[in-house]
Swiss-Prot record:
Gene3D superfamilies: 3.30.300.20, P-loop containing nucleotide triphosphate hydrolases. The gene is der. It comes from Pseudomonas syringae pv. syringae (strain B728a). It holds the Pfam family MMR_HSR1. GTP 1 binds at residues 9-16, 56-60, 118-121. GTP 2 binds at residues 202-209, 249-253, 314-317. This is GTPase Der. Signal peptide: none annotated. Keywords: GTP-binding, Nucleotide-binding, Repeat, Ribosome biogenesis. CDD domains: EngA1, EngA2.
């Protein structure tokens, strides 16, 4: 399970600056989903091989009578969702009554919490530690979030109890090569014993629970149904047609008589963790509402994680032909960026079309974890360049030399060449589409990474055989005799 870290504290103590530094800004996947997250912002980050989910809160304010429950609501929810709480305080402002209130709340919740003394620039660290020691949460960790000072120490302390990622190759490490002439293979992953892990995600009230219960119908073999904590999703291994799957339910599996709730509880943390743990994501939408902005935000989660994707338009029954045509046009217009994903029109309540989801799940998973030999990927690259060469950069043309597989789920193709940093986005899309078409990839995003530098074979010397050595000597002797004859004639 991916750990969750919450940043809490008074307003203006540097939480957002810290959030942006840890997520590198562009890694933040969602911010301020109206009506769902309000003052909380979620992002993914990674430090020394450990992935984690980061929650930024809007701030907690308090007075001598206690914390303002309305203003602190989202921050308190973030504390409940978190495995670790980083309690930011302002070292310049010193220890305040609001800090005391927050510290008391954290002690009562018995959460793993660390005081982080931010804005430590030009301030004695020992004095800062001493000032915040009365909170009883241990020594404060001195940092300067704006300049990155002390960040490594803070993360080392916060994440030391959590293991490193196991399902992703280290940066720069190639996946195992496939022998020349050998067929493409599936890459076995850590989830093999439980089969394909499927995450069911979507906005509240689109029918996720109904779909989960339909997929776990009487003709399925449910191995067990063991819920985790209130924050955890439910992992349910089951079998269908002798194929193993593990369903990750973010809404919670309910008995058939209890699935008709007005509003499902929505948790961004559950969604992020489910996507991170899954091999394939089934994204559920309400066909009657069409594509809304919240759908696009949630799709961004799956794309950022690079997971294989299947889209299910639920509540398709009961719609008129005109309404269905309009929805299809909207899908084509607004979901063009996930045109690689299969779209199914289903009714989870009645079971219409649900069985077809499994074939798309299988196809998407196979595309996401298949590996190909370097020779195959390089040949596709050469054919693509031959058909449509990269553009000129000044008086020189970009040269793409060879390609190899750099990772899976999603497939990562690493292309080596010269001036690769100048490859335009349009040409990257052309290469992505070419690889997708030739390799017949469905349901998975594909990523291309460029690497420049020298030829890796430069400096290698060929070792001549004895026959080649003797031939070389004869040729050199012949040339010497010919040169001598020309000189004698002069």
């Amino acid at each position: 399970m991916v750990p969750v870290i919450a940043l809490v504290g008074r307003p203006n103590v540097g939480k957002s600056t810290m959030f942006n530094r840890l997520t590198r800004t562009r890694d933040a996947i969602v911010g301020d989903l109206s009506g769902l997250t309000r003052d909380r912002q979620y992002g993914e980050a990674k430090w020394q091989g450990r992935s984690y989910i980061l929650i930024d809160t809007g701030g907690i304010s308090g007075d001598e009578h206690g914390m303002d429950e309305k203003m602190a609501e989202q921050s308190l929810l973030a504390i409940e969702e978190a495995d670790v709480v980083l309690f930011l305080v302002d070292a310049r402002a010193g220890y305040t009554a609001a800090d005391q209130m927050i510290g008391e709340h954290l002690r009562k919740r018995n959460k793993r919490s660390y005081v982080v003394a931010n804005k430590i620039d030009n301030i004695d660290e020992n004095l800062a530690r001493a000032e915040f020691s009365p909170m009883g949460l241990g020594d404060a960790i001195p940092v300067a979030g704006a300049h990155g000072r002390g960040i490594s120490q803070m993360l080392e302390i916060a994440l030391r109890e959590f293991p490193r990622d196991e399902d992703e190759p280290e940066e720069g490490v190639e996946v195992e090569e496939v022998a020349e002439g050998q067929e493409a293979k599936r890459i076995p992953g850590p989830s093999e014993k439980d089969g394909i892990k499927i995450a069911i995600i979507g906005r509240p009230n689109v029918g996720k629970s109904t779909l989960v219960n339909r997929m776990l119908g009487e003709d399925r073999v449910i191995v067990y149904d063991e819920p985790g904590t209130t924050r955890d999703s439910i992992y349910i291994p089951f079998e269908r047609n002798e194929e193993k799957y593990t369903l990750i339910d973010t809404a919670g599996v309910r008995k058939r008589g209890k699935i008709h709730e007005e509003v499902e509880k929505f948790s961004v943390v559950k969604t992020l963790q489910a996507i991170k743990d899954a091999n394939v994501v089934i994204f559920v939408m309400d066909a009657r509402e069409g594509v809304v902005d919240h759908d696009l935000n949630l799709l961004g989660f799956a794309l950022e994680a690079g997971r294989a994707l299947v889209i299910a338009l639920n509540k398709w029954d009961g719609m008129t032909p005109g309404e269905r045509d309009f929805v299809k046009i909207e899908l084509e217009r607004r979901l063009f960026f996930v045109d690689f994903a299969d779209i199914h029109f289903i009714s989870a309540m009645h079971g219409t079309g649900v069985g077809n989801l499994y074939q798309s799940v299988q196809n998407s998973f196979k595309s996401a974890v298949t590996r190909w030999p370097t020779s195959r990927l390089t040949q596709i690259l050469e054919d693509a360049v031959s058909e449509h060469a990269p553009p000129m950069v000044g008086s020189r043309r970009i040269k793409l030399r060879y390609a190899h597989l750099g990772g899976a789920n999603p497939p990562l193709i690493v292309i080596h060449g010269n001036q690769v940093e100048k490859v335009p986005k349009s040409y990257v899309r052309y290469l992505e589409n070419t690889y997708r078409r030739v390799l017949k990839l469905v349901g998975t995003p594909i990523r291309i990474e460029f690497k420049g530098g020298e030829n890796p074979y430069e400096g290698n010397k060929n070792t001549l055989t004895d026959r080649q050595v003797n031939k070389k000597r004869r040729m050199m002797s012949h040339h010497k005799k010919a040169d001598k004859k020309r000189r004698d004639k002069r």
